Amino acid sequence: LDIAREAAKAASTTRVEAEKALAQRVATQTAVTKQEGAEKELVKQAAAEKAAAEKELAQKVAAEKAAAAKLLAEETYHAIQDANSAAAELAKLRRAAAQSLTALDRAQARLTAAQSASEQAQAELVAAEEALSATDADKAAAAKEVEARRVAAKGAAAKVAAEKAATKRAETQCRAADASVAEKRAVCRAAQDRAAQLHAEALGGLPPLSSDQWDYAKARHLIVRAGFGGTPDEVQQLYEMGLHGAVDYMVKFHDHPVANIEFDPFRLERPEPWESRLEPDVERRALRDQRRNRERRQQAELRQWWLRRMAESPRPLQEKLTLFWHDHFSVQYQDLYRTYMLYQQNQLFRTYGCDNYGALLRGIVHDPAMIRYLDNHRNFKNNGNENLGREILELFSMGEGHGYTEQDLREAARALTGYNYDASAEQFVFLARRHDETEKTIFGRKGNWGGDELVTLILEQPATARYVASKLFVFLAHENPEPEVIDRLVHVIRAGNYDLQPMLKNLFLSQSFYSDRAMATHIKGPVELLVGVIRDLGLASVEYRAVDSAATQMGQMLFEPPNVAGWEENRAWITAERILARYNAVANLVDRPNTDIVGLLEGKGLRSSQEVVDYLIRTCLSAPPSDAKRLELVTFLGELPPPERWDAQRIELNARLRALVAAIFSMPEAQLG
């Protein structure tokens, strides 16, 4: 019984302790629950504060942009009105001066005639006085006539003097009007500078260059980097536009004509049904080889068509960025064997490459060439292929190892299941039954995401704007930019919802773009070099098949990048083998019978060998050579005949000048842009 009582007592004690433990656990759980509730409330409050802050920031940016835009409109309007009024006044004064000069010429002619008549009358008077047979009446008449002519001559002289004074006054007024126009143009430039400064500050962009720092060298830098180059006349025209006008001219190219250079590719030819009945197999192979040869020829024609567009298009920035995106979204023809697909992709880059990166990225996930190249036509639910999903994040949008996880890569691939193409039409198709419609978690967000939603999620990630801004800056300006420079470009890109034109304008107006780190520091790729020679010299009737072959020998065959990461840039272009190929390619391009260097020089007021060498250096180089190298070029050219004899010696002179240009382009400075 005692044992039972002890056991009961122990059980009671255990129960009490258990109840206490349970009560403590309940209390702890309650406290945890309260803490979780409080934390959730804090998270909710933080999210609300973040949303409010973002809203306030957006409103502030919008207000600043509106204020900057208003100030820009007011200052620019008044400055332009003043400049236009001054220009009209100057034109009026110049017309008056021209009329005065014409009247002066007529009066001068009358004075000359009167003086001649006076001299003749004087001679007649002397003759009359000396004539013994002359009567007094005749003498008086002759004297009267002479006096009348003297009076007329004196009146004509007075009139000429008055007209000279009027002309002098008109010239003074013209000079004053010129000064007024220059002053008002300076006011206009100052207003444009102020507006650009306010706009950059409102967007958080790069500080702009002052218009006073704009010169010919910077105009050439702009036309080389935002395009491929240009003749001295084209560079001079850009310089005379001023900084803001030149940048607008390059960036707002949709106002320019479209290059009238057509290419009409055919889709991949497929065997006809009757070919299967041919005997022996050698006949079928012969037909297959014929189709392959036609496809290869078409691919070569596509490369030559694009080279011609780059060299002749009135929209050089459009073609320059088409080349950039072609390298960024790399696809190899040898893995596709489909020219039509690559033509479509090239047009995609041309259409969206200067407009909106988001639209371009959406185009890529629907692009038949990219889908086939990265095997997304084999990416189905329950049987996935991660190639496109991986490269979309690693190479095309965010950069390797920035802002995503391996889980995000796998989920991105699932979002792209069913994104396919029709092999016959070579167009995008969505296979709904092959698409994975289950929930996916990408960047921590859950949903039944597809390819279009994937692009939206990518664009929301901070790493995306930074990656795009960095790659464009390095391509257009210089390598290894400072982080704060990229930060500012990121602000502009995100403020414009990935619209690239505001970012490009901010970059091309910026101090960073015209810094010593940027000017004449970029080693041109083979295509940039060859197209630049064509544009710098204004070459006509170019054999683009030879240009294509030369670019290939120099290491850059269009539509055949070495891998999905594209070509290695800058110093990778310069090897012992490739540098020799570069010299030979440029020499062969320049040294053709129809390359008329004399025509490039005519009408420029050049007479001496030194002047010709200096002009061609400005034509071909972004960075001047040393004095010693310049002297070598002058010695190489030798003495020149007078310009009036150039046409008669055109053939011989062109041969000498072509050799000189080839020598200039073989200099190390010619490899830089």
Can you annotate each of these PLM segments?
Residues 1-201:
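Extended amphipathic alpha-helical heptad-repeat regions
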Residues 200-226, 230, 237-239, 243, ...:
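N-terminal leader/transition segments
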Residues 220, 299-304, 318, 322, ...:
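Solvent-exposed, amphipathic alpha-helical "stalk/arm" or coiled-coil-like segments used as scaffolds
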Residues 201-204, 285, 299-306, 338-541, ...:
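Active-site substrate-binding loop specific to GH73 endo-beta-N-acetylglucosaminidase modules
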Residues 320, 345, 369-370, 615, ...:
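Surface-exposed interaction patches
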Residues 210-214, 220-231, 461, 465-496, ...:
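Flexible, low-complexity segments enriched for small/polar residues
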Residues 230-350:
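N-terminal accessory alpha/beta regions
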